[in-house]
């Protein structure tokens, strides 16, 4: 067993230098000390990547991907991205729209005719920006229609949707975070591509970018992959092993995600206009109590706070993930971990140092 690490944030004790190179040196020294604790513990770990003004200033990892075999984490170790899968799903759908293979304002039911007729007004755009009104299936896993479906997949979910006869609100009138929306987006993308969701991602994005350590849940994981195992108290959510794809279910490595984020910001996955659309909130209403708003696959800061910033975190079993970009401060970072609450304090402090040294720099 391993205990939760508790680390005191003490950035205020160090004066943040004005010179960029000095800030980078301070950041590296500080985060190295943090990650070294994981290596000493010989438990689950973390991988961290930071880019500032187009320069990769940090790309390191610590801890074990697989404790039993003493396999360490490295830049090619794959992690389940959990909800940080959503930006990748949204970018694929946007790319398909820009290629003319689907339209954002088409009804979802056009692509998925098995959907309940009362969902007929829901568009692909509504699904992307969380304004569809479909209740989140994650909140219904204890229902009689879902309980016992161990290994729950997208297809099973479509067949047994608990709330198929109602919506929480009329599409486009409110914003509400729902994993259900991204299950439908994955299925729509599959239909538009004429392939499975994973194959569509691989052919259109992963292979062109050289992302050789990225896949989806349903694909074979034996192709030389070193998977960071999930070290949590349970590998199930309310008694069910989830194998849904789109909102979650994408596995990737630090090196691959860095390729993806750099290509995304350079307009190589979707156009620059597309990235602007994806990082613009459709409604001013917050999607979370903390005030964040939602774009298309991205969580955006509250109004008038950190303009140009977009992020998405993920949490599933022992996996804790985060992808963050900023087109104003030009600070981008990725954090992947497999130790649940054991490593969460470390991730929090790494984020603190990023914000204090780079995002809040003079």
Language model region names:
Residues 1-4:
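Bacterial N-terminal signal peptides
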Residues 20-81, 103:
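Short, conserved catalytic-motif segment at the N-terminal edge
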Residues 39-47, 69-126, 167-180, 245-248, ...:
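Short active-site loop at a secondary-structure junction
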Residues 63-67, 241, 340-342:
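A short acidic/small-residue loop/turn micro-motif
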Residues 66, 119-317:
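Short, surface-exposed loop or secondary-structure junction motifs
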Residues 321-340:
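Short, well-ordered beta-strand elements
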């Amino acid at each position: 067993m391993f205990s939760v690490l508790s680390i005191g944030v003490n950035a205020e004790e160090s004066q943040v230098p004005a010179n960029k190179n000095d800030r980078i040196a301070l950041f590296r020294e500080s985060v190295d000390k943090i990650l070294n604790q994981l290596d000493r513990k010989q438990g689950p770990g973390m991988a961290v990547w930071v880019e500032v003004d187009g320069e990769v200033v940090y790309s390191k990892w610590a801890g074990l991907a697989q404790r039993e075999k003493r396999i360490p984490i490295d830049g090619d170790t794959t992690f389940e991205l959990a909800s940080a899968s959503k930006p990748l799903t949204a970018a694929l759908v946007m790319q398909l729209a820009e290629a003319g293979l689907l339209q954002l304002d088409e009804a979802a039911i056009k692509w998925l005719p098995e959907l309940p007729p009362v969902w007929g007004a829901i568009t692909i755009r509504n699904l992307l920006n969380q304004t569809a009104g479909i209740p989140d299936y994650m909140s219904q896993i204890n229902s009689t229609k879902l309980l016992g479906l161990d290994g729950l997949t997208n297809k099973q979910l479509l067949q047994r949707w608990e709330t198929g006869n109602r919506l929480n609100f009329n599409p486009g009138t409110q914003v509400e975070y729902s994993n259900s929306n991204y299950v439908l987006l994955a299925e729509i993308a599959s239909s538009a591509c004429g392939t499975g969701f994973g194959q569509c991602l691989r052919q259109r994005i992963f292979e062109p970018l050289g992302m050789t350590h990225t896949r989806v849940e349903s694909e074979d994981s034996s192709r030389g992959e070193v998977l960071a195992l999930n070290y949590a108290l349970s590998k199930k959510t309310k008694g069910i092993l989830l194998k849904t794809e789109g909102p979650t279910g994408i596995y990737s490595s630090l090196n691959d995600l860095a390729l993806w984020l750099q290509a995304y910001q350079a307009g190589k996955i979707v156009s620059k206009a597309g990235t602007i659309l994806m990082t613009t909130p459709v409604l001013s209403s917050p999607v979370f109590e903390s005030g964040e708003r939602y774009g298309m696959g991205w969580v955006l800061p509250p109004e008038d706070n950190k303009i140009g910033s977009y992020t998405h975190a993920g949490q599933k079993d022992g996996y804790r993930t985060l992808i963050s970009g900023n087109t104003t401060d030009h600070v981008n970072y990725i954090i992947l971990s497999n130790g649940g609450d054991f490593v969460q304090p470390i991730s929090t402090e790494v984020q603190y140092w990023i914000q204090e040294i780079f995002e809040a720099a003079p």
